[in-house]
Amino acid sequence: MLALVSCTSADADLSDTITVNQANSITLKKIQEYNQVMLLQHPQTRGTNGGLKIAAHDIVGAFSGINAGKAIAGLFGIATGGTGSAATIIGCGIIGGAAASYNCYRNNKGLTTKIEDFYKYSLNIINENLKSDTTNYYIPYMYNPKIIHVKLPKGFETLKDVGEAHNKLLLGSNYSSPSTRATVVRDPVDAKIPPILTLDKEKVKIALNSKDFKNQFDKIISNLDKSTIDGELDINGYFRKNPTGSVRAENAIKEYLKLFTTYPENVDDIIQITNDYINIIESNNEFNDDEKAMIYAGLMVSIYSPQIWDNFK
């Protein structure tokens, strides 16, 4: 179970949910050194992957969604470190990543649909999952993802749900009208994601359906739009508009995006760099759990998203 520290209602500032850290970091230096080594491997085959540049929106949406979820859990008095807090944080991360992905797709295709429709659709799916201790509700939306071997540390394993549910929300929607229940399904399989098991289900539902989260959601999507030029995300511009409060975590995801958008030639490459990033972060014991959760959620989405957008064709 993801164990994160939530803000109290008295000190939860949605624009600054984590204490600002110094940009100077041993861990970041090691990450930068790792990037340099990886990009020197077969440089003649490495180039910018346009599809992965689009997937950067998904990663940042999940990263920011996790940060928003931490504050939302605190605002609604959901017990710190409990299953309710984790469910709220993960739910916000799922919606943030999937909606950012859909919004980028919508903009690139010139669709007239509203992101509001996808937001309502996503909440509907999660609300239904909160009603049950089973995952049968998700079965019609299954697809057969590539088996992944990601080594998330103890306490962060449930962040895989952010990546998996990201794809299921997208595949379960009708891209031209995501508020409907039409499906886009690939090879239905009985591969269920864990249900939302928490004694705080009603609090979690209230938090996820709150105006407070909707305001944060709107801010994330709006700032992604404002920071996107010709389909490419200006990550520095985005974090200037929508800071998380952790310069260190922001810099870590920036470094990951540099490698993610240029190095991978297949999903196995993404899994490799994801595991290596996790190892670097864990071995230096410098980032706190809140920072790790944001980063790891983004990494999980980076593995799953290219599998539905066919970024390596």
Q: Predicted segment positions?
A:
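C-terminal motif of bacterial Sec signal peptides marking the signal peptidase cleavage site
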Residues: 3-6
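Bacterial lipoprotein signal-peptidase II cleavage site
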Residues: 8-15
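Membrane-engaging insertion elements
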Residues: 17-23, 28, 35-47, 75-146
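Hydrophobic alpha-helical membrane-anchor/signal-helix detector
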Residues: 54-68, 89-98
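Eukaryotic long, low-complexity intrinsically disordered regulatory regions enriched in serine/proline
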Residues: 67-72, 76
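Mature extracellular/secreted ectodomains of secretory-pathway proteins
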Residues: 106-313
